[in-house]
């Protein structure tokens, strides 16, 4: 067969081995080590350069980030190892329909800065649960949301990225899985703890460049190996495992592999689900997810946030060419491994009887690239893994510190919040390591589809609550709460059913209940959104309307309302802490001052004890950004959160023009591959 003949010769190893013994050579290791040193240098530089001794300095990078690091961080936070492995794997298994997720995300990352971000800015929020607390009042919605976000981060984002990175790292280096993961997590946590969001954004900017260079090089090698896009279209439909049973349809390429819009009933991604069901989780991710929104809140002003979103949107065009198409090429070059159809053979190839499409990208790297470039692509995968993990670590730490810990300890000092945020990162690392065996046992044949199905069960209710809060002034706390709870309960029921009734292999009879077998997860997303929307509207309409202060400057239609001095309102969570002139944390809008732990320590320890403090202790305090500065060096006042929506007219015009160009490019790609 032509596709098999074009495969590079395997080294002396088991022909069924997914990753031959051809491993990284000395040149590859040198590139990888230099990359690590460079990234750590950038992280340490940003650690020294930026303000880290305030809540905003650590969690929002001081609110002074320019458009290009914001855009690079948005892209790098989204495109992790799960994208490289998952998108390429889905491309190999089912064609380019999975590209719809990337093109769909392009629209919503722009919607974030043009529509949602102005509301968040005028509302002066740091986290998404904080927005809901201000918009609806009470604590039950923000607490439910905070716990849900942490659940999603730990058990889908972190675990998926670690599993995807492990596929590449373990097989290319032939080292113990846990040793590789623990080492990566240690480096990742180090500059996340030390530098806060500034270190994350600066390293994301560097790693975005590394990812794009390496992925573009591999794309060139991939298309050259199959004769370009025309050659891929011809050879992809011939890419079948040589040991496939002749009477079975298992392992055959899909006839609609080069189309995005597919049959609404029998296909793997029905077109109504792509247009509507996919949009709800996409809106949650790009417009209300803490990981993404936190990057735009760190921008210098609204124009820089829009510029960052535009940069990320332009980059979202690339995954089709640097991930999906290379995954399809990998199937053409290595059909016996990537396109294996027999469960026993797949088990020998990749230890997964459901299929081995997820090895498509690592297989391409290890077999196609020469020495040196393999090391560069290894660095790209490590960059993707660390970028995604640092973003999640920092954002999850922000939610835990500002929305849960601050609720439990309303009088927590600035210093305590800093320490708690860093310690929580360490706990995330521990939980992530313990979750690795579960991830290994639960992954199916297509990692990316697993991610999206889980998202479709948990994210739509949250997205609907945010939409109603931002665009319907009549929505109140009772409606949002009952809509959120009902939606999450239905989503959890479907999630549990999916785990109980596992999707059968191609050669097995599907005996699952109709609600699982016949209702596609994208259609379920539409149903879940509708139920939540109806519940929010009905309950809100028949209960009391929200107060004026819960609407003013917190919806799209009231974002330009004048700032009103609020009366003292009892709240379980105090307003954000800032630093007063004498260095003590001061609650915004009140005269209450809380003593810092540093001042309490100074009452019990003499100046001599301070000067004789262990160098190790000083180093730890500096790492946490809470080092003792002495009375003559009181911490400076934290920069105020941006509240102005004013933009330079010329800059605004250029941004709007680029918005039109970017959307036009996306519409063209939708139409070309539809």
From Swiss-Prot:
Compositionally biased intervals (Polar residues): 578-589
InterPro entries tied to this protein: Na/Glc_symporter_sf, Na/solute_symporter
Region (Disordered): 567-589
Protein name in the entry: Sodium/myo-inositol cotransporter 2
Molecular function as annotated in GO: D-glucose:sodium symporter activity; myo-inositol transmembrane transporter activity
Protein location: Membrane; Apical cell membrane
Known function: Involved in the sodium-dependent cotransport of myo-inositol (MI) with a Na(+):MI stoichiometry of 2:1. Exclusively responsible for apical MI transport and absorption in intestine. Can also transport D-chiro-inositol (DCI) but not L-fucose. Exhibits stereospecific cotransport of both D-glucose and D-xylose. May induce apoptosis through the TNF-alpha, PDCD1 pathway. May play a role in the regulation of MI concentration in serum, involving reabsorption in at least the proximal tubule of the kidney.
Gene name, Swiss-Prot/TrEMBL: SLC5A11
Stretches in topological domain Cytoplasmic: 47-56, 124-140, 202-208, 294-308, 398-418, 468-479, 543-653
Any single biological process term in GO: myo-inositol transport
Residues in the Extracellular compartment per record: 1-25, 78-102, 162-180, 230-272, 330-374, 440-446, 501-521
Reactions the enzyme catalyzes: myo-inositol(out) + 2 Na(+)(out) = myo-inositol(in) + 2 Na(+)(in); 1D-chiro-inositol(out) + 2 Na(+)(out) = 1D-chiro-inositol(in) + 2 Na(+)(in); D-glucose(out) + 2 Na(+)(out) = D-glucose(in) + 2 Na(+)(in); D-xylose(out) + 2 Na(+)(out) = D-xylose(in) + 2 Na(+)(in)
Gene Ontology CC annotations of this record: apical plasma membrane; plasma membrane
Organism superkingdom: Eukaryota
Transmembrane spans: 26-46, 57-77, 103-123, 141-161, 181-201, 209-229, 273-293, 309-329, 375-397, 419-439, 447-467, 480-500, 522-542, 654-674
UniProt entry tagged with the keyword Cell membrane: yes
A Pfam family it matches: SSF
Membrane topology of this protein: Multi-pass membrane protein
Regulation of its function: MI transport activity inhibited by D-chiro-inositol (DCI), phlorizin (Pz) and sodium (Na(+)). Insulin increases D-chiro-inositol uptake.
Coiled-coil residue windows: none
Family that this chain belongs to: Belongs to the sodium:solute symporter (SSF) (TC 2.A.21) family.
Protein source organism: Bos taurus
UniProt entry keywords in alphabetical sequence: Apoptosis, Cell membrane, Ion transport, Membrane, Sodium, Sodium transport, Sugar transport, Symport, Transmembrane, Transmembrane helix, Transport
